[in-house]
Amino acid sequence: KDYRTLSLEMLAQQLGFNKNYLGNLIKKETGDTFKQLLQRQRMLHARHLLVFSNYSMEEISEEIGYLDTSYFFRSFKKTHGKTPGQIREEALHRDL
């Protein structure tokens, strides 16, 4: 789950597939490109970390492969409709 270095090329090499073949197979089976699939997994992992860990926003951003925390915030809000801070705050209030 190292989102910082995961790439279609690396995955194809590990599986013994041609990069283009694997990309087309992923698109056919999921309806999403590898990049879209990876982005969704990153955001799901970030949400999990926000709810179930005490990691800082910067640590979460880095953990899922974003070097720019503000870009992570924008991507997260675009995906979830809420900021990372809002998700964490809701999780904290739910546990009370």
Predicted regions and their residues:
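Short hydrophobic/aromatic patch on the recognition helix
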Residues: Y21-L22, I26, Y71-F72, F76
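Terminal helix-turn-helix DNA-binding modules in bacterial transcription factors
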Residues: K28-D68, E89-L96
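Helix-turn-helix/winged-helix DNA-binding modules
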Residues: Y3-R4, Q14, F52, I64, ...
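…primarily DNA-binding HTH/wHTH and HhH modules…
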Residues: R74-L96
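Short helix/strand-capping hinge loops at secondary-structure junctions
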Residues: K1-T5, T33-F34, P84
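Membrane-proximal linker segments that couple transmembrane helices to downstream signaling/catalytic modules
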Residues: K1-F17, K28
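Residues within helix-turn-helix
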Residues: E9, N20, S56-E59, T69-S70, ...
